[in-house]
Amino acid sequence: MTNRPTDFWNTDLPELLGGLAANANGLTQTEAEARLERYGRNLLDTTNRRSSIRQYLAHFKNPLVLILLVASGLSALMGEVEGAWIIWSIVLLSVTLDFFQEHRAEHAANLLKKQVAVRATVLRNGQPVEIRLEKIVPGDIVLLNAGALVPADCRLLDAKDFFVNQSVLTGETFPVEKHATSLTEATHEFSEADNAVFMGTSVVSGIATALVCSTGERTALGDIAETLTRQPPPTRFELGLQSFGQLIMRLTIFLVLFVFLINAVFQRPLLESFLFSIALAVGLTPELLPMIVTLTLSRGAIRLSKKHVIVKKLSAIEDLGGMDVLCTDKTGTLTEARIRLERHVNALGEDSAEVLRLAYLNSCFESGLRSPLDDAILDHHELDAPIAAENWTKVDEVPFDFERRRVSVLITRQGQRQLIVKGAPEDVLKHCTQWQAGDDIRPLTDDDRQRIKRLHHQLGSQGFKVLGIAWRNVPSTHDHAVIDDETELTFAGFAGFLDPPKQSAAAAIKTLTASGVSVRILTGDSEEVTRYVCNLIGMPVSGVLLGRDVSAMDDASLAARIRDVNLFCRINPAEKKRIILAFKQLGHTVGYLGDGINDAPSLHAADVGISVDTAVDVAREAADLILLEQDLNVICRGVSEGRRTTTNIMKYIMMGTSSNFGNMFSMAAATLFLPFLPLLPAQVLLNNLLYDLSEFPIPMDNVDSETLQKPQHWDIGFIRNFMWTAGPVSSLFDFMTFGVMLWVFKANEALFHTGWFVESLATQVLAIFIIRTAGSAWKSRPNPWLAATSIGVVLLTCLIPFTPLASALGFEPLPPLFFAILAGMVLSYLILLEIVKRLFYRHMAKQST
């Protein structure tokens, strides 16, 4: 059988095993490696990965770069060979530096992602081993359980209470039960193949052993990948980049057309004017921005990895820096997630070994995703497990789901059949008609219900997480358990669990709150338990909403109600998602921390989906960030790093839209009164290249502690206002330079070009020391590398007119007096820019209050 999408579910199992040369013990490691070479990696290549050479060449696809290369080629054909070579060399150097930095950054980020890649358990040499999904091959035997992602198209060999979510393929969100049996009727529709599971689907409950039949692009998912592939909605950061790009493009088009038309009116050489216009466009275009963004984000990802946070989606770092609401469960964040069974009481509140026995039998035979509560029951020190389960065997099960909030197992012993139900107390109690008092079974009156509810609340107020336990006998011929069996139950009692509060939680919540991040608890626990834990750690409760309240509200009412609520109790997964979307509707940047099987929708809905490395596969796959330890302090450190990363990206953007824009505007305006071009095209490109070189260390720059104390949001309005404020300051000193060169030095064309080239680059580059901080430039220390490259580029610029390259570039040596004037002008420019910056931030602060 070949590895392609076939109706393998219709094939007899012995024939299928024979065709794949497989058996129930799995493949040998040697055979698996040979098949990996033969079939290729188990990947959907929808990303169209490119070789390094193609990635490098893609940098030349920038329309402005292409126009520049073509135009300079025409210039060479007309005899301007030297100028053309200079332009080509500068473009080549700029593109090469850009590619090298971006490629290295992406490589580092991809290495980090591999640390948290989803893995699968397969049989190799007869033993279960964990391998990366991409190494699975046809013929492998895969072990599947609740929470796992199905790694390939597989035929089931064995399945027990096995339910799968196939919505990625069918759009149907309700779980489908699968069986390890032959189909009674052949079908060509994979949605009707009840004995097969498919790549990309997820296991909701149960366990199974499966034979891999198709991998990678030959799976059902791979066959329709192009129709399924949808770009995720852009993040706030990505939308901000798009808006910024549109702003720059509009300015660039206006200035380029203006300059070209002015030169045409003055009857200057058209080709040279065209080259100058395009060079001006290159100078205005922040072509280094993609590299700066990638490099800054990847460096942020590397720093986050050292703080136990692995980044799967780079743009999520910026959203982490802007996060102002964090939604999280109580368990593992406010508590230690070390759950112990402390109480097992009957309906009268008395300790009961019978309640413990029933709870044990339910947890022992449950085959779905075993919760920490099940583990606590099975590990309980008072329990004699062999005696408790003696001679009992399982018949069937109704798996847990978040609508019923309970799980039932049907067991049998010596002709007796019993259904044992365990779940949320209120959901168990409402299906009971009797209660157990020792050996007596009594009718459940309204007074009994109220007494049992009071007992439940009493346990909750003492910090116990409570499960209700009930049972009923069924006929010995009853072979299948269904939801309708969960009626006329006998209430046995409660199992009470304690999860000690996490000592670090209080300090972490205070740190997050002081940093502008509001922590909201979304839990399935009762209000009493959640309040108890919050009181222990000193977390004030500002408001409470229950799941039933959330479900009764429409979206608008929910958004209006949640502003001051920080506890959401008895919440199911659908309600969690609605709460997250409501916070987003209010304009918040929302993070969600989840690790459960039904947390994927909420992780997708949040701006920042956060999970832990011990989470189920579906949660880890849906998350943007993976925590290597479940601790709010890790998120505190992550938020700080996200803000640092965002701030450094903003520094480059604000540099490009202030001093750089001011210089390019001056260049355009100078064409109105100069009898020659303000700078030659090659000089404009060299100016741009040297400026870019000075900006390379921005991703490593230090960030003021004050900046790290508040969310850093992308704000295109802020950028635009800063451009119109700081840009004219740069232009003012450019025009002063024009006056000095024309009236003091009586400069010819070459000397004018040289003087303004040096001054424009000096002011443009050194402005970073002012713009990089919202506070005092004299008190904020830049990264040494940034300081060194900035000063180094300015010194290099001053030396270029005295090098052998000067004549080729159209420069000539400057008189000593020029440098004295330059020093005074640069100092004056930086002082004025600092004053204007402070006034700008003061004005913006008043507007925001």
Regions found by a protein language model. Name each.
Residues 163, 169-170, 180-184, 336-358, ...:
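Basic, amphipathic juxtamembrane/active-site segments
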